[in-house]
Amino acid sequence: MKAAVKIGFPFTPDIEKDMKMFYESLNEKDRRHYAALEAKKLCYGGISYIAELFNCSRPTIHEGLDELKKKDS
């Protein structure tokens, strides 16, 4: 029987640090949109991961996703 392989998220600590610095340089609306885009790229678990990484709420990310959907319409 094979051991289970743990699949983690793709960001190294250095990349996470750069992402946080960039996130903190943005205004509030752009932060929502950036967090939403990063969460969307990660699919399952992405919202929770990005919310923890950027210290923002999951509803904030959902709001960003909604705003981006409205922009596409």
Please name every model-derived segment:
Residues 1-72:
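Double-stranded DNA-binding cores of transcription factors and transposases
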